[in-house]
Amino acid sequence: MPNAQIPVLKKNRTKKRTSRKIAILLILLFIVLLAVLFFRSSLSRVSEIRFDGNVFSTRDQLLNRSGLAVGDQYFGVSSSDISEKLREIQSIQQVTVDKQFPGIIAIHIKEFATVAYELQSDGSLRAILANGTSVSVGSSGIAVEKPILTKWRSDDPYKAKLCDALSRIPGEWTADISEIIPAPIPSFPDRIKMYTRSQFEVITTVSLLNSKISYLNQVLETEDPGLITMLEADSYVPFKPDTSEEGQEKDTTQ
């Protein structure tokens, strides 16, 4: 009778379920075994660390700050942690970490732009970055089109503001500025004096520099060397010729 076959069907179903469980367990064990073998193999380790874009920080400095080393667990490396650690270096503005399987960590460094150089008491120059950080020039070389800051105190609050202002001005507009020195007065505590390679003398303030730079370049391009004042009002006065030199020239022509 049909009812006599029901126990047999239940036994078959039980066997099938047991077989499936065993198969699943075997698959899981196989996956675990593969994972153990993988994490013990060289494929799971950092095999190469690359840096690019760094000028003021050496490879050793970046490695020490990041804590990275060849042989570290590749999947244990946190891109956000590395970026955060490297951005603690004052010359670094942005960090991008690119993990390339298997084993390669490529780190792209963006440093703050150099806006000026500073003359030290021993005659050496240090690069001044857009955030006001002073760094050793080293083997990176000097960009001759950048101004030199002289007579600035290290704790002068207007120095960092000046660097920020310079970073916002196109490089071709500051290329003629050769030197910037502080020249504060009671009414203008952030007053500065600038000298240009084209023999102009410029008086302005840190806070006005960005808004006055277009006027400055207009005068530099169209006028003879002279004194340019860019404060509440703008003015230009050409330098008077040296009468003594003119007299000497006349004597030699007679």
UniProtKB/Swiss-Prot annotation:
The keyword Translocase does not apply. Disulfide bonds: none annotated. Residues 43-254 are extracellular. InterPro entries: DivIB, FtsQ_DivIB, POTRA, POTRA_FtsQ_type. One of its GO terms (cellular component) is plasma membrane. GO terms for biological process: FtsZ-dependent cytokinesis. The chain crosses the membrane at residues 22-42. Residues 44-112 form the POTRA domain. Pfam families: POTRA_1 (PF08478). Keywords: Cell cycle, Cell division, Cell membrane, Membrane, Transmembrane, Transmembrane helix. It is a single-pass type II membrane protein. The keyword Transmembrane helix applies. Residues 1-21 are cytoplasmic. PROSITE patterns: POTRA (PS51779). It is found in: Cell membrane. Cell division protein that may be involved in stabilizing or promoting the assembly of the division complex. PANTHER family: CELL DIVISION PROTEIN DIVIB, CELL DIVISION PROTEIN FTSQ. Belongs to the FtsQ/DivIB family. DivIB subfamily. This is Cell division protein DivIB. It comes from Paenibacillus polymyxa (strain E681).
